[in-house]
């Protein structure tokens, strides 16, 4: 499955994927790269999931992401939602607050794949 996501990465540029992220998250935010600090609180990844299936998100469980504990909770929730949607997730929760660029890129590819049914 990771090879599948790597094929998506190969067929799309980072700019294409970031464009989709920015399209989904407008007007609140604009990310410049997959190591953008705005990914650190997990809220952007949750918002990407809501673009696929809005009813899956319980916004009462999403924290402001201001503390390390909030970031951990949001990251775990984002991963949980992605798995419920059917994504194969390779990252662990602490890849998100640590801004592991490669893992966040693969997570976004998984969400992109679900949204546009590339498989």
Which sequence ranges carry the predicted segments?
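Alpha-helical coiled-coil scaffolding segments
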Residues: 1-119
């Amino acid at each position: 499955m990771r090879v599948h996501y790597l094929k998506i990465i190969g067929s799309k540029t980072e700019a294409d994927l970031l464009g989709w992220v920015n399209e989904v998250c407008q007007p609140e935010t604009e990310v410049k790269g997959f190591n953008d600090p705005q990914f650190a609180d997990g809220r952007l990844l949750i918002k990407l999931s809501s673009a696929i299936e809005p009813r899956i998100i319980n916004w009462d469980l999403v924290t402001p992401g201001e503390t390390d504990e909030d970031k951990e909770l949001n990251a775990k929730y984002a991963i949980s939602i992605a798995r419920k949607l059917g994504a194969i997730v390779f990252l662990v929760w602490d890849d998100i607050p640590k801004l592991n660029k490669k893992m966040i890129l693969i997570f976004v590819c998984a969400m992109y794949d679900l949204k546009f049914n590339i498989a």
